[in-house]
């Protein structure tokens, strides 16, 4: 069985927790739940296939951490050091493993045993239903691929270089969503280190979602054809607190 079952949460660092909580409640169409997370105040939103967690920062806003659901953290704790991944602090009994960024190409990643208590989720037809993909920007797709597929055992589904997009794209399945690695070609990033880029949210009815977000005061682009066949997308241009944000629907 795979070490990682799904993406438990995406963590977004924001300057104002109150303001960001309002914005993400409007964006996601879900209530904000205030709760403690790793000793600090956070706000959580539950979606169909993952959660969004907001935490306050004095540093740059944006996507800060991916937390993977791992059914057996004890065996992961045994296995990961053998493939070169180290932990920030492995508190026994805590069932939350933060990986040392020096061993994960600078990315802030963690594994946790999923606590499914109280994960109620319901949404209107125009609401965002879940995450479609989380995007990592990479200077070296091969090394990032080794991290995600060889070490973390995510299933690689696609490795595509398209000069029209000036990019190499690698897709890794995680539960029912995708961790996408985006490697720019013309202006490459530094090969040593990756960084989190953006989030693409899934909508069952993108025209309704687009209209709803405009009605809630978001600056949203028109719906256009997506890169993947049979998809349509629009860009959310404000109130996402440093996270490049796309909404994706299927025809």
Q: Where are these predicted regions, by residue range?
A:
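Short, flexible segments with low predicted structural confidence
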Residues: 52, 118-121, 184-185
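Short, basic, helix/turn surface patches
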Residues: 58-64, 114-116, 184-189, 247-251
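A structural feature that tracks compact, well-ordered secondary-structure segments
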Residues: 55-57, 67-71, 79, 147, ...
